[in-house]
């Protein structure tokens, strides 16, 4: 009889990828199956193993992709197959996340499970909006309340008198459609009409939006701008603190929604830094890398080459791993090292090695080109060269529907090509997704890092709007600020 797998009910946190717990991230990294919701940031799925099965259980307003009963059945079925299963849920599984129902279903079938708490949006979204849910001067009590229950009309039956009289700060979850009902009942049961209210949409994301008012005015304000879920509604005097301590929305790239052409299997440093400055960054395409057999003759003759050219930082790192795994002493290599990029140069420098730029190669003698399958297009001056393929990198088709759902939620304003090598795979990836690349980018600004990248984009039929003065992140950020003005 097959041993049952374990199910991990993991809180993904409120949106910002960096707010997931260490234990939650570890569960994703070890998962064989992940069932994920709409409100779990899809970028968290990139921590999963390449062969992990991804199942979307997302719930859009009035449109459920997979009903709760079906989710419960899937969790049980996958665990009975002996799989390590992660149920990835926005916020905390136990705070209006139906984690209790899923745990009960697993217990009923004797499936081992663990619950991994997450930061709930009622606290995190408020904090990112500059509002602590408690404050000695404004509020010493706090409550989280569902604004939409399982009744036929969805209007929650609450102890309104207790909420109005006894709770200083109230966080209503998913309350946009029932906002008139909420405000009416709070005022009817004694809450002052001028009590501050704020709605926070997509809290902790770069696309976070807020609308402020009072119990008497907020309904009209929300209707005027067609505000929608996912949103937290925060009611209480502590909302007024926001004017003084708002911090997230002051980041230099807050509100920017950027599409970044991707060349690496991991998150790029550019994406990481832009995110830290407040932007939402979607990287595309998502790559997966598989191992390849290394040519034994090349390994045996590694000491005979005059020049070794690394096509990418990843291939440089893989090269040294390959040498170590084959028991080869680096000191046996007499070749000069050459690189195309600063990142590759850094990989070698960190190992105490010096390298030269590929443009300085001249007549390389016996040359070894080290790279992945899509890099190996070097053209020398007629000299023969050998190839060490360190891995085979392909666009990860499993992530294409994930990318399409991210696009549904986004309102992109900028596309960035970080290198000339990023242009062709990006265009081919969009085509594979069934998207018209030119239509997708017709209303957004295109930024290219360097003149060579700009020429590659133009050759692909793309209109380039900006080329930063220098090929570094600081210059890129200044360029993005200029676009936003």
Positions of predicted regions on the chain:
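Signature of uroporphyrinogen-III synthase
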Residues: 14-15, 61, 67-75, 79-81, ...
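A glycine- and small-aliphatic-rich helix-loop capping segment at beta-alpha/alpha-beta transitions
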Residues: 25, 101-110, 130-136, 188, ...
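Well-ordered beta-strand positions
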Residues: 32-33, 53, 169, 307, ...
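Class I SAM-dependent methyltransferase SAM-binding "motif I" and its flanking Rossmann-like core
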Residues: 92-94, 99-166
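Short, basic, glycine/proline-bearing loop/turn elements
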Residues: 3-12, 56-61, 143-148, 281-286, ...
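Catalytic phosphate-donor-binding core of small-molecule kinases
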Residues: 135, 148-151, 185-221
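Class I S-adenosyl-L-methionine
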Residues: 1-17, 22-119, 123-124, 231, ...
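Conserved anion/nucleotide-ligand pocket segment
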Residues: 152-198
